[in-house]
Amino acid sequence: MTRTDTHAPLSQDALARLAGVIESRKPANGGDPDKSYVARLLHKGPDAFLKKVGEEATEVVMAAKDLDHGADKAKLVYEVADLWFHSMIALAHYGLAPADVIAELERREGISGIEEKALRKAAARSSEEGGA
């Protein structure tokens, strides 16, 4: 078996392990804001960690654009890792886990992006009509 063959399960395991660490760093679970970056962000509340998600998303965009001008691909990977990490903090705060995101991606598998977007628009219209 090659590394490519085992990449997905290892990635999911790594995400699950990281999610466990983040969960353990929640102040409610004994995470100390003076000793843990995750605990500090969670202690400060959603504004703090959501600001970081926004900053990291912007850095992903900038790193991707830099690739068009010869930048190293590793920079994009680094920034996406930061975005995923901070997004996982947000997920944990709201009682969610990477498995929830993976389940949603699996749900979308085989559905074209155009079709999926049309289904969301139809559902939104239906909700608006039912609520009016």
Curated annotation (Swiss-Prot):
CDD domains: NTP-PPase_HisIE_like (cd11534). Transmembrane segments: none annotated. Gene3D superfamilies: MazG-like. It is found in: Cytoplasm. It is an enzyme of class 3 (hydrolase). Its EC number is 3.6.1.31. GO terms for cellular component: cytoplasm. Keywords: Amino-acid biosynthesis, ATP-binding, Cytoplasm, Histidine biosynthesis, Hydrolase, Nucleotide-binding. The keyword Transmembrane helix does not apply. Its main location: cytoplasm. It comes from the Bacteria. Pathway: Amino-acid biosynthesis; L-histidine biosynthesis; L-histidine from 5-phospho-alpha-D-ribose 1-diphosphate: step 2/9. One of its GO terms (biological process) is L-histidine biosynthetic process. It holds the Pfam family PRA-PH. Belongs to the PRA-PH family. This is Phosphoribosyl-ATP pyrophosphatase. It comes from Acidovorax sp. (strain JS42). The lineage of its organism: Bacteria, Pseudomonadati, Pseudomonadota, Betaproteobacteria, Burkholderiales.
